[in-house]
């Protein structure tokens, strides 16, 4: 099975252009962050990018409109990472209906506990949009089995007990946790948070089915040097393809 490359970008005024670059340079699934005023799971790079997007006037409606206008030009799958407050404000059913309409493959909601996620999934089950499960390093075996049983799309394993973007300070039991998860499910188990270098990728993707890279890609797009960014993306893809 090909290892999944899941880059994260901020939903800003350039996000469609950035999606096209990612789509053309090895991404399997693109994660689009919806800017939010209190992003509890985000590190400083993504938080600053979100604040800039808010100042640009980017809203969930802007993101939906841009996806609607450009969905035929994006070949890979894309998911939204959004805080629950945005979904509630929009209206749960209306939000997922719009996601389906604009081609969103799945939604990641980092601040919604598992039990409430299950209730939400029941409410929006008529829409063809997956709710992606996050599993933290602190989850015990019973909780893991329960989450895995209902997981869809892919499982996003948080590699550390911290916000995004820390440099490679992965939890010491991460690989064991990944192996344990993979033994209980057939859907891809990916690792995210703090992955940046070729060494990180090689280290984790030997066990995981893929990696999510966020802060490093957000930082590179903010620097607006597309040539360097494309070189980095190709390196990531090549590294994953050797595993």
Curated annotation (Swiss-Prot):
Family in the record: Belongs to the TrpA family.
Enzyme class: lyase
A GO MF term: tryptophan synthase activity
Xref: Pfam families: Trp_syntA
Function: The alpha subunit is responsible for the aldol cleavage of indoleglycerol phosphate to indole and glyceraldehyde 3-phosphate.
GO cellular component: cytosol
Organism: Staphylococcus haemolyticus (strain JCSC1435)
UniProt xrefs under Gene3D superfamilies: Aldolase class I
Entries under SUPFAM superfamilies matching the protein: Ribulose-phoshate binding barrel (SSF51366)
Keywords: Amino-acid biosynthesis, Aromatic amino acid biosynthesis, Lyase, Tryptophan biosynthesis
Protein name per Swiss-Prot or TrEMBL: Tryptophan synthase alpha chain
Positions of the catalytic residues: 31, 42
EC number(s) from the headed UniProt entry: 4.2.1.20
Pathway involvement of the protein, from the record: Amino-acid biosynthesis; L-tryptophan biosynthesis; L-tryptophan from chorismate: step 5/5
Recorded catalytic activity of this chain's protein: (1S,2R)-1-C-(indol-3-yl)glycerol 3-phosphate + L-serine = D-glyceraldehyde 3-phosphate + L-tryptophan + H2O
Subunit structure comment from the entry: Tetramer of two alpha and two beta chains.
Signal peptide: none
Name of the coding gene: trpA
InterPro entries, A to Z: Aldolase_TIM, RibuloseP-bd_barrel, Trp_synthase_alpha_AS, Trp_synthase_suA
């Amino acid at each position: 099975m090909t290892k999944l490359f899941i880059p994260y970008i901020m939903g800003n005024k350039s996000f469609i252009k950035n999606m096209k670059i990612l789509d053309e340079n090895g991404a399997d699934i693109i994660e689009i962050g919806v800017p939010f005023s209190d992003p509890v799971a985000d590190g400083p790079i993504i938080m600053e990018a979100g604040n800039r997007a808010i100042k640009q006037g980017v809203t969930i409606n802007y993101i939906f409109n841009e996806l609607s206008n450009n969905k035929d030009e994006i070949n890979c799958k894309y998911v939204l990472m959004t805080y629950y407050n945005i979904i509630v404000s929009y209206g749960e059913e209306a939000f997922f209906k719009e996601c389906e309409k604009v081609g969103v493959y799945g939604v990641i909601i980092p601040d919604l506990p598992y039990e409430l996620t299950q209730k939400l999934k029941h409410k929006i089950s008529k829409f063809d949009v997956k709710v992606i499960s996050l599993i933290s390093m602190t989850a015990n075996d019973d909780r893991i089995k329960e989450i895995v049983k209902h997981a869809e799309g892919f499982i996003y394993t948080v590699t550390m007990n911290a916000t995004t973007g820390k440099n490679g300070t992965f939890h010491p039991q991460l690989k064991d946790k990944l192996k344990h998860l993979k033994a209980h499910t057939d859907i891809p188990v990916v690792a995210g948070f703090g992955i940046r270098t070729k060494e990180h990728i090689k280290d984790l993707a030997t066990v995981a089915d893929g990696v999510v890279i966020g802060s490093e890609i957000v930082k590179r797009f903010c620097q607006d040097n597309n040539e360097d960014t494309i070189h980095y993306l190709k390196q990531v893809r090549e590294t994953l393809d050797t595993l």
